[in-house]
Amino acid sequence: MTLRPDITTMRNYQYASSIRWGLSAIKLPSNLGITSSELNARCFSTSIPKFSTEESTIENRGNIIYQPGVTKYAGQHTFMFYETEDSLIAKFINSYKQKTWKDLSGVQEPSRNLKADLKFSLLTSMDVEREAYNMYGAWVKDYDATELGSSNSEIIKYTVTFQYDYFLRV
């Protein structure tokens, strides 16, 4: 085994591109005013879901060792969307808000009606799914939007954070 790959070895690989991915909804709450493909078409940035494993520390008479402890899902995942003139992303966020905390009354739908199941897929260069992550029990927790101004023509962007229960690599 060589310690450093040569150019011939490197040329044999088909490297995975960071622009080949897709977002789809396995299940969306009703009456959000948006479809899975409309969300996907406006989504321009995200990351791969992650987990972390806590450590257990074992200390005995001056010796310390570590072993894997509890593994936890990050619990939150962020997607960035371009807004269109039909205000579809703003309406989606507001529809979610109305389901989780209705204006002036604080009425909330049952949580089973609020949660979505989202699928984040990584694609090959031929746009064939090569791996996917299903996020279960997702709902809109927070969002942020582009600051409006008067000196540029930047497109309005929404950063939407979803809280989720867990994800599986499928």
Predicted feature residues:
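Glycine-rich, low-complexity intrinsically disordered segments
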Residues: M1-V170
